[in-house]
Amino acid sequence: MSTLHKVKAYFGMAPMEDYDDEYYDDRSPTHGYGRSRFEEGYGRYEGRDYSDLRGDPTGYLPLGYRGGYGDEHRFRPREFDRPDLSRPRLGSWLRNSTRGALAMDPRRMAMLFDEGSPLSKITTLRPKDYSEARTIGERFRDGTPVIIDLVSMDNADAKRLVDFAAGLAFALRGSFDKVATKVFLLSPADVDVSPEERRRIAETGFYAYQ
């Protein structure tokens, strides 16, 4: 094409069909808004519950793949992450083990009730009802320290036995002391039980093993 014809085509004096140049091509431009490589391969994922981007005018990303997991949480606490409330705490376990060790320690018990100790003749009675009060009175009258364990008795009978034992201690100049819950020590006049010895009786749980 001559230079004059190109000038005419530029100013509209010649039809564009006659304008033939190496830079002009009626084909689609090489760089444009054609289908992207992503869209060309998109059809392979249409059957797997992926959100469709092509019809979304907002251009936001899809929520993602919805298959397989549903609406459940992706992460759940593992079994060993959950606190097990049925297990005992360490502090309570140590306290219980300490009491158990004291109760089963033969050396502590031997020191407390060795020969010559005022408590060497001690006996433990576990009355079931008030009718056994006579046995308690006879042991106490004979000069034997008596541990009275009323745990298995109902409160009414236990109260009557406590009153009876307190009366015995007063009448015969003895002593009547509480060792533990519903457990009492009735001591004759010639047996002096110190507060430390009463504490050791409670700690060793001696009355529970007689």
From Swiss-Prot:
Q: InterPro entries, per this entry? A: Cell_div_SepF (IPR023052), Cell_div_SepF/SepF-rel (IPR007561), SepF-like_sf (IPR038594)
**The keyword Cell division is assigned to this record:** yes
| Domain of life from the UniProt record | Bacteria
Any Pfam family from its record, for instance, is SepF
Q: Tell me where in or outside the cell this protein is found.
A: Cytoplasm
Q: Name one GO cellular component term.
A: cytoplasm
> Mostly located where?
cytoplasm
Q: Which Gene3D superfamilies match?
A: SepF-like protein (3.30.110.150)
GO BP annotations, alphabetical order: division septum assembly; FtsZ-dependent cytokinesis
Keywords for this protein: Cell cycle, Cell division, Cytoplasm, Septation
Q: Which family does it belong to?
A: Belongs to the SepF family.
Q: What does this protein do?
A: Cell division protein that is part of the divisome complex and is recruited early to the Z-ring. Probably stimulates Z-ring formation, perhaps through the cross-linking of FtsZ protofilaments. Its function overlaps with FtsA.
| Assembly and interaction partners | Homodimer. Interacts with FtsZ.
Tell me the protein's name: Cell division protein SepF
Q: Which organism is it from?
A: Mycobacterium leprae (strain TN)
Gene of this entry: sepF
